[in-house]
């Protein structure tokens, strides 16, 4: 939200007042202090109760925030974000969050149950090999001598993701899953395996999780005796180490050696998350420890796969109704691909987008109704929500004015809203159909999704005959996902075509218009299959078919032509990007700049820019007049930093000071200054209009202050003993 | 695709600037001017003057501040949604953040940590937070009518226990949290990885929300991806204030106040005055020798011993050594070997400074 600059507050705001008072001066030098305690209103959980009731009086329909009211409220008391808006955000976001969690859980469930089966089977085999008596089991002797009895059963879970962040949740889920199956589970992370606390630290951590949270000794016999208590021994003990590569190798090796000594008495299963390669443990563990491991490998799905699944569930299946514009999607994609690469950050980006949407768009609270499952909710309830003010705001939306919808079509609004709510369905079906087709070319849903949101795309041009020839002749269409889909279509083998048709049929089942078209393809498919069988080569790809296959080729050609026609039909009829629909602003977040600045702070660039272009931020009259020349009225640090730009990687303090002084002392008064420079007592004000030379001491003090401020921002390094007259520049260019 | 190109372009610009600057340094010889060529005023006066510097553009700055005031409600909304706020941009943000806290966060308890101070004990902060929270929860239970459990005292507990208490389950409404304001989360006392880990764990607690400010351009390097995405959960806000770093800068030395002759002579005099008269006299012998032999590397230790013994300032080599150790500790004297391999003592001050120092001592 850009500061409007029209605020009634006088300049002497409380910031400066509180800053100077003696009370805060004392607080400034305390390491920490309590600024204030919560006012009693919060204790009842009615945070904005006062505001809410106030609104009730003002507005006949408190359910919706009116724009005009909103504006006045914003100016009056800043309570722009009502409890209602917060509530709706909570509803919407928790829905999205839950969807994502479910998707991730599903994507891991196979691996999880695999791990559990492995634990069960191995546990049973250990038990059957020979149960120990209680007294034997809690003693550290007799020392077991058979090599096989010292093996520690280990599951290596390959995360296929270098970033650990995404897998934290995975391992938490795994912990819950195994606990629900009756296992005793403890989770350790690299923090527990520090060289500082040694193996004792992680043993303590284990005992705290297994036995009781107040244990403060590291003794593995406690674990053994605990295991024999109260039927604990009926279930296996599982230890999860989620980021093996980051653990301190020797400590982890020690733990493995200790636990393996007790392997028979306490059947322990070690689950190690490995993100780099399956031989990673070889690099960090000692040979002794490695010999004790009896490893089994499990592999999780890759981040890109999970990403596509999340995308599908959040945007293409009915979820919260919240969606993003083409530009935002492109930004999220490039952030995922170029900057971070973790699903966690993608989800965070989505949450920030959602938050920004709610804080920018007053009508966003209507999303609440999209969250509910019923389709026709709005028709009844929706109309009564529409107050005069909402209507005004709604009809001022750019998408509405662009489509020349006026107030005369007042009654149409519920219809449009209903359409919005229904709209994604055929659209998302088409996107998913394209995704199915694109899978043969290893296309990512993320790419398709980004392209398909483009409101200016003209897909149909790909179907013109010249374009088809073009696309076959050269490879320019790399960025163009839909063109790639169409091209790949012509290279598909009959079996691939038939599997694609099957998935299309399933996808379109709820939508008869498309479904009919898909079913119409069946006869062609049968013809292709028949032709293929006649040739005895039902699965050979088209390319390698011999000349004698001309019949099959002909049928295939007819088939692919037909499929292309169906795709054309789908694109033409249903591929209306959300941004071309009237009233889409209610559910579509579009402000990519806001998202970017909130997500990616750029202190390195921005702080330098602040200094180099200070007058743009301060909007002062005095400094912005004359282009690039330095004026004495500018901020001192800003002058100094601009001067620093002219120096090499080190700056001579003397020269720097002299040029700083030259700027501060205007040329006209320089002659006068020379005669007076000894009089230090004259401390004169420097005013923009009539700059008068400040005293030497003041210039020096201001120089010191400015250098200190540059040092705080980390833009320069102070003089060293070796180079006492120079400071070093740290940042070059913004 | 465009983004990738932009990034590449930025990186190209950055490296070009860097090499240009390096080239500039190599091609033209570095300026040989010395700081001592400037007539630097006394440190005392410098500090006094520094405190009287008038703020430029104070009108524009306070306008900027009141512009930010319009965003307070948005910030509260973001805090309630579970994000942490990270303020950056040039200028002290202390006043801004505290004003925000006292104006808009009245419904929540607010604890301020001054990260710019050289030492902050995070354990004590956690204790204070835990006590605040238990108070808050007690009030809540009372008002909702349920029985309050007996609370143990916190000081005996470990950091982990306190953190897990702060991360307790949210009862009913999600709005029960304490707001922690951290000025300069990149400050000297908090810059070590352990403090940052603790702060990250604190910020991920369900009953805690963080509002922090950074000033250093490289502050984000303090955090790894887990801290950024899972724990701090920052929302960045670019809020340059151009306000002077009054409190934040207190612990930084003044660049012009180091190494000036007057300054070192003065500090040396202060040190010497705290020594015994015999110690002072030994130093005087050394100083006079250095003044009369300006071309030599220094006074040989043996010569100093015999000269001091003659005048009954020291009785043995041991006493002389104890004086010398004292001098060396305060950097009043340095040892060197001259061309003959003799150990020589040298006062690392200019002749002028030594003369000044002798004058001060004789007063």
Swiss-Prot record, chain A:
The keyword Glycoprotein does not apply. InterPro entries: ORC3, ORC3_N, ORC_WH_C. It comes from the Eukaryota. Residues 1-25, 532-554 are annotated as: Disordered. Residues 12-24 have a biased composition (Polar residues). The keyword Glycosyltransferase does not apply. Induction: Regulated by E2F. Accumulates rapidly after cell cycle reactivation by sucrose addition following cell cycle arrest mediated by sucrose deprivation. Follow a cell-cycle regulation with a peak at the G1/S-phase. Mostly expressed in siliques and flowers, and, to a lower exent, in flower buds, leaves, roots and stems. CDD domains: Orc3. One of its GO terms (molecular function) is DNA binding. GO terms for biological process: DNA replication; lateral root development; response to sucrose. It is found in: Nucleus. GO terms for cellular component: nuclear origin of replication recognition complex; origin recognition complex. Component of the origin recognition complex (ORC) that binds origins of replication. DNA-binding is ATP-dependent. The specific DNA sequences that define origins of replication have not been identified yet. PANTHER family: ORIGIN RECOGNITION COMPLEX SUBUNIT 3 (PTHR12748:SF0). Belongs to the ORC3 family. Component of the origin recognition complex (ORC) composed of at least ORC1 (ORC1A or ORC1B), ORC2, ORC3, ORC4, ORC5 and ORC6. ORC is regulated in a cell-cycle and development dependent manner. It is sequentially assembled at the exit from anaphase of mitosis and disassembled as cells enter S phase. Interacts directly with ORC1A, ORC2, ORC4, ORC5 and ORC6. This is Origin of replication complex subunit 3. It comes from Arabidopsis thaliana (Mouse-ear cress).
Swiss-Prot record, chain B:
GO terms for molecular function: DNA replication origin binding. InterPro entries: ORC2 (IPR007220), RecA-like_ORC2 (IPR056772), WHD_ORC2 (IPR056773). Disruption phenotype: Zygotic lethal mutant phenotype. Seeds abort early, with embryos made of up to eight cells, characterized by enlarged nuclei in endosperm with arrested cell cycle. These phenotypes are partly suppressed by mutation in MEA/MEDEA. Its main location: nucleus. It is found in: Nucleus. Keywords: DNA replication, Nucleus. Induction: Regulated by E2F. Accumulates rapidly after cell cycle reactivation by sucrose addition following cell cycle arrest mediated by sucrose deprivation. One of its GO terms (cellular component) is nucleus. Coiled coil: none annotated. It holds the Pfam family RecA-like_ORC2. GO terms for biological process: DNA replication. Expressed in female gametophyte and embryos, and, at low levels, in trichomes, pollen and the mesophyll of leaves. Follow a cell-cycle regulation with a peak at the G1/S-phase. Mostly expressed in siliques, flowers, flower buds and leaves, and, to a lower exent, in roots and stems. Belongs to the ORC2 family. Essential protein. Component of the origin recognition complex (ORC) that binds origins of replication. DNA-binding is ATP-dependent, however specific DNA sequences that define origins of replication have not been identified so far. ORC is required to assemble the pre-replication complex necessary to initiate DNA replication. This is Origin of replication complex subunit 2. It comes from Arabidopsis thaliana (Mouse-ear cress). The lineage of its organism: Eukaryota, Viridiplantae, Streptophyta, Embryophyta, Tracheophyta. The gene is ORC2.
